[in-house]
A protein has these predicted regions:
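Terminal, low-structured helical/coil segments at or just beyond the last alpha-helical repeat
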Residues: 301-358
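Flexible inter-repeat linkers and adjacent short helices
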Residues: 1-127, 131, 135, 340-358
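Flexible helix-coil transition and linker loops at the boundaries of alpha-helical arrays
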Residues: 45, 82-90, 123-134, 168-175, ...
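Ankyrin-repeat and related helical/solenoid repeat scaffolds used for protein-protein interactions
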Residues: 245-316
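Conserved alpha-helical positions within TPR/SEL1-like repeat arrays
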Residues: 58-65, 92-106, 135-150, 177-192, ...
Length: 358
C-alpha cells in the first residue's frame, strides 16, 4: 500500500475526528524536517509567532525527569501543537506530533493516538516528505506504525513498518539505533500476530545493531531492552533456561550502569518476573512485579495500561505463591539470583515497554 492509499484509509476511518465514535527520536525528526519545511514554505519566518522546537523538547524532558508526566505531559503537548500550528512551523509541529504519539501510547490513549497518526501522515505529505527518504519521514513512519501496533491495528501497522524499512535503507546508517528500534518494534508486531519465527529474526538483527553501536554493551539500556524482549520470546517458545539468562542479563546491565532510576527499568523487572513465574519461582516473581509496579507508578502514574497489566500480573503471582505455600520476602530485590547460567540461544519481544520508545 502506498502513502496516498494509506492516507485515504486513515481519512475515511477518522473523517469526523476521534471523539465521535463510541513515542523514537523526535529531535532528529525535527532536524531532518527543517530543510524540507523551508523549501515548502519559504515565508514561514514572516509569521509574528515563533516556535522553539528545542525549548519544547527540553521542557518535555524536564517533565519526565521530575516524574510528573501523568499529569503534566498531556496538556503540555496539546499546547505545543497549538503553538507550532499558530507559528506556521510545520517541522516543529511534526516534532510535537511524534512526541505525542509516544506519550499517548504509554498512557493507553490509543483511539486519540490514531487521530494523531493521521495528522502526522497528512502533515508529512504536505511537507513533501512522503516522496523522499529523509530521516524525518523514516522516524514519523516508525512512530506511526508503533502507535497503530499498540492500538492493535496490525495490518496498517505492518504496512507502515515496511514503508519505514524502505526509507531507512536510504536514510539511516547500518548501525543507527533507530534502525534497531524498527527491527525491535516489528518483532513485537510479529509476536503479537503469532509469527514467532519472524519475531526472532527481527530481534536478532536489532540486538546485533545495538551491540555493534554501543560503547559499552554491558551498561547500555537499549541492549538491556533487547535482552528482555528476547527473554520473553524465548519464554513463549518454552526455552526457560535461555529465557532466564537473558532476563537476568537485562537486570545486570541496569545495575552495572547504575541505571535503576530509568523509567525503562520497569520493563526489565517485569520481564524477569514473568520468566520466574513460568519457572514457578513465585517469590522472585512477586518481588519483581512489586518493584516494577513501584517504578511504573513513580514514572507514569497508576492510570496507564502498564500499571494495570503489571498489577494484574502481581496479583496472579501472589495468588500462586500463596497456593504453593511460598513466603515472599518484601525486602528482596528482583534479579538477585546469583551467577548467571550459560545461554545458547537468542531473541525478542516484550508485552511491557516503557516510554518511548520503543
Amino acid at each position: 500500500m502506498d502513502e496516498e492509499a494509506l492516507l485515504k484509509q486513515f481519512a475515511a476511518q477518522f473523517a469526523h475526528g476521534p471523539d465521535d465514535a463510541d513515542d523514537t527520536d523526535a529531535a532528529a525528526a525535527a532536524q531532518g524536517a527543517d530543510s524540507t519545511a523551508n523549501q515548502v514554505a519559504d515565508d514561514a519566518d514572516q509569521s509574528p509567532a515563533t516556535f522553539d522546537t528545542q525549548q519544547f523538547l527540553n521542557g518535555l524532558d524536564a517533565i519526565f525527569d521530575r516524574h510528573t508526566a501523568a499529569t503534566e505531559a498531556g496538556p503540555y503537548l496539546e499546547q505545543a501543537m497549538v503553538d507550532a500550528e499558530n507559528a506556521g512551523d510545520e517541522a516543529g509541529l511534526l516534532t510535537v506530533l511524534n512526541e505525542t504519539m509516544g506519550f499517548y501510547r504509554s498512557q493507553g490513549r490509543h483511539k486519540e493516538n490514531q487521530w494523531i497518526v493521521q495528522r502526522a501522515l497528512e502533515l508529512a505529505a504536505r511537507m513533501g516528505l512522503t516522496t523522499g527518504t529523509s530521516e524525518a519521514w523514516a522516524i514519523t513512519l516508525i512512530n506511526c506504525a508503533t502507535s497503530m501496533r499498540a492500538a492493535k491495528q496490525y495490518d496498517q501497522a505492518e504496512d507502515l513498518y515496511h514503508q519505514a524499512q524502505s526509507v531507512c535503507r536510504h536514510s539511516l546508517a547500518p548501525t543507527d539505533r533507530r534502525l534497531a528500534a524498527l527491527h525491535n518494534n516489528l518483532s513485537m508486531l510479529y509476536s503479537e500476530t503469532n509469527r514467532p519465527d519472524k519475531a526472532e529474526l527481527e530481534l536478532r538483527e536489532a540486538l546485533r545493531i545495538i551491540e555493534a553501536s554501543s560503547v559499552n554493551p554491558d551498561a547500555d539500556i537499549d541492549v538491556s531492552s533487547s535482552h528482555t524482549n528476547l527473554a520473553l520470546t524465548l519464554l513463549t517458545e518454552h526455552k526457560l533456561e535461555d529465557a532466564h539468562w537473558h532476563a537476568a542479563k537485562a537486570l545486570e546491565i541496569y545495575r552495572t550502569g547504575h541505571l535503576e532510576h530509568s523509567a525503562h527499568y520497569a520493563s526489565a523487572l517485569a520481564g524477569f518476573a514473568q520468566v520466574c513465574f513460568a519457572e514457578r519461582r513465585y517469590a522472585d516473581a512477586v518481588t519483581g512485579y512489586r518493584h516494577a509496579l513501584a517504578v511504573i507508578e513513580e514514572c507514569y502514574g497508576k492510570d496507564t495500561d502498564y500499571w494495570r497489566i503489571t498489577a494484574d500480573n502481581l496479583r496472579q503471582a501472589e495468588e500462586a505463591a500463596a497456593q504453593a505455600g511460598v513466603t515472599v520476602d518484601n525486602a528482596g530485590v528482583a534479579g538477585d539470583a546469583g551467577a548467571l547460567p550459560q545461554s545458547g540461544s537468542r531473541l525478542p519481544n516484550s508485552p511491557a515497554q516503557g516510554k518511548t520508545g520503543a
